[in-house]
Amino acid sequence: ADSVNGAKIFSANCASCHAGGKNLGVAQKTLKKADLEKYGAYSAMAIGAQVTNGKNAMPAFKGRLKPEEIXXVAAYVLGKAEAEWK
């Protein structure tokens, strides 16, 4: 997965709620590594599934993003989580 594309896709589609790894919808479920691990979402597959299908306040991106774009943004989120969103 291409992290440059992942960053662009994140900026265009995710940053309005998840800038800096935060979560404006459900504050305790951030995109930080510890929270992703706590909620069983610290994998490209889990992040990709949530982006694809949505959950609770998060909309589904299935019709808006191609599968390869979802894979790129999931890889980007994992990389940023690993780096503590710095």
Swiss-Prot record:
SUPFAM superfamilies: Cytochrome c. It is found in: Cellular thylakoid lumen. It holds the Pfam family Cytochrome_CBB3. InterPro entries: Cyt_c-like_dom, Cyt_c-like_dom_sf, Cyt_C6, Cyt_C_IC. One of its GO terms (biological process) is photosynthesis. GO terms for cellular component: plasma membrane-derived thylakoid lumen. Its main location: other. GO terms for molecular function: electron transfer activity; heme binding; iron ion binding. Heme c binds at C14, C17, H18, M58. Binds 1 heme c group covalently per subunit. Keywords: Electron transport, Heme, Iron, Metal-binding, Photosynthesis, Thylakoid, Transport. It comes from the Bacteria. Belongs to the cytochrome c family. PetJ subfamily. Monomer. Functions as an electron carrier between membrane-bound cytochrome b6-f and photosystem I in oxygenic photosynthesis. This is Cytochrome c6. It comes from Anabaena variabilis. The gene is petJ.
